[in-house]
């Protein structure tokens, strides 16, 4: 919206870059105000001149009007710069008052204006009200002025010396007026004669003339003061206002105007102002000025902005609502923020709102998944959302859900939002048992109906839970029937917690028959809870007709390598289960033989049938896939001994290959500069804070940059994108700190950066798709094949210099041959992907038979399955069901006449496509196994992790 025109006026030899930056920031802030005014259908046009630059800021129509008047811009620039601000003599005012151009007079005027503003604020309005100095000096207890320096009494600014005036302006944020006893004269009335209003400071274009303007004022809602003025006729006497600017160390520029406005104010002391309901037949322009009820917007603004008198003139078609648009937007943002806080609290397992870490969620995609957002609305902090987006979010509130996939870096979710409940002194009351069917078990309120626990003994929480979930069915129980139902539910809870009632001791029966806050039941050890889960897992494993395992390793806080083993199995009903099988500490050697012995021991612990093992997914390290002594080789040998002819499939993780492929681009000359500058900014707190402020003032899209790490390679694309979109800001910031980056001025380097941005964003999109929940191996393979096809397409497009799929590169491309330079890099990337996916090529026919049974060619099917596949392809009933439900649900409807094909599908369905599930476990381990609880035994940690997964 802002436009800058370079003037031909002479430039000062020593210009302050810091002052220019301040001017640029303020113009940017003014531009943001114009955007908000445009949403209210108000038109604004502003011209600012600084040295040789002319800034045009305003709404679309306002800028169009000013841009059409280039002569007006030139005249205004010459007037402001050619003569010099200090040499301009103001025209003689009508009332004969002389306005001095000296420094003291300007400061006195600024102090007087601020006193008027503070006095008006004390009266409950945001407009400036003349201060009754004589009355205040006569009756000093009526109005108290706070914040003045010691030894300085309140008086008219014309009696202050230069040093006192400067001190007042530098510390004006702490000055305030307190009215203990209002004055009853007409001067004190809001809208009385001599009142300084926004209308006095409005400027009419010098090229246009207008007649008197009738101004109707409306009383503020909260002021409690009735306005006496019925109409104000404003006449403009001066065509060319004089603008004075004074820069003082430690303060921002303040402006005053010496234009004189004659006001005719007919007063009626007996009749308050009442808005007329009749249409106005006066051809003169009618303007309504409404007071702003939000005083915080004035007190919290910057010092330089407080001195600016911004007039908003609107012509409403109908009566405005009581709440201003700013208050409505604020309410919307608060409602959306409360919604997000409640949803985030539910995601981390608490029943109260928790402050949402918006920055961490935005800069760490994939850690927290937000489902149910309206189409086209991206999750952001409410302060960055449009009004329409916030309304759509509130309409879809019941569908929005937060899911924590993996912990956010630097955020302990186990401690987020925890309240100091012990300090609240809440006690469970016995009457809540009968009212809401709750009892206290181990000092925790527990619902007798659904066994759900509340974190706090608070009646509101218990009543809300009961009315929301159970009142419909349990309100029918009254008096004696309700007591009997309560006794019955207590027995059910006792059986639920302790199992059979025959084994209970009398003490335990007494605990649950008469629960009280002072009685405590024994705590069930975590090993016992995990033992029950392990027993259920053993039963589930025995029902598997096919299963696969995924193996990965990581080093914990104790510098111990932890080997995680996951199992994925399919039963006869084609129900898929993914469970943690075991975690094994690797304290000795980490050879393939040692890993095999640990895995074999874990499988024996669960009595797993080796003949049903289909595949093993690993990270592809030498200890895993070595042809002689690797883990996969030994597992294949063991499976062959149990089931002759069986072949164990080996799958290398297909999530990590694009990280390795990204290294094949060989663009370290770009990444080194980006990493160096980003880490320099982010690793120093002061630099990071200042850079965030810089981006905020320049109204950039991103508030900060992502900190780049080699381990967290997923951040590569996000870092590059934010770096490219903030090139100008980074260049300016680094240069101002004595760390210039000459590469940012190189066209070739910027072109390489743009290509790397596009390429890494494509790779990140692929990675996020591969990390979906419950992914079938065929779906993941389809995603990789699709990406390979895209690489071929991009290679063809680049030969024609078609940059349709490289939008960032297209922005900086200037020559038709720019795309040709990157064809070899695409070719290398394609070759590397094909090499990494060679394992899947071996099983492509089997995967195709699983995903597309009705379109597979019989010649590509294994001989033992051909007859059943032919029968299947000719079965129209199953074909209809396949088209309706798709895979994998379709295989639940297969009849018993396809036993071999069903077994084949069960094996494919059981395969892991990656070790991503292991990485999720390691995230939980890092979150839980901190330095404060790292001394637990391995068996205890095994139990904890098993319960957590």
Curated annotation (Swiss-Prot):
A GO molecular-function descriptor: DNA-binding transcription factor activity, RNA polymerase II-specific
Keyword DNA-binding: yes
Major site of localization recorded for this protein: nucleus
Gene Ontology CC terms: nucleus
Disulphide bonds in the chain: none
Gene3D superfamilies per record: GTF2I-like (3.90.1460.10)
Organism domain of life: Eukaryota
Location of the protein in the cell: Nucleus
GTF2I-like repeat boundaries on the chain: 98-192, 323-417
Pfam families, A to Z: GTF2I (PF02946)
Tissue: Ubiquitous.
Tagged with keyword Transferase: no
Alphabetic keyword roster: DNA-binding, Nucleus, Repeat, Transcription, Transcription regulation, Williams-Beuren syndrome
PANTHER family on file: GENERAL TRANSCRIPTION FACTOR II-I REPEAT DOMAIN-CONTAINING PROTEIN 2, GENERAL TRANSCRIPTION FACTOR II-I REPEAT DOMAIN-CONTAINING PROTEIN 2A-RELATED
Similarity section: Belongs to the TFII-I family.
Disease: GTF2IRD2B is located in the Williams-Beuren syndrome (WBS) critical region. WBS results from a hemizygous deletion of several genes on chromosome 7q11.23, thought to arise as a consequence of unequal crossing over between highly homologous low-copy repeat sequences flanking the deleted region.
Entry protein name: General transcription factor II-I repeat domain-containing protein 2B
Species this chain originates from: Homo sapiens
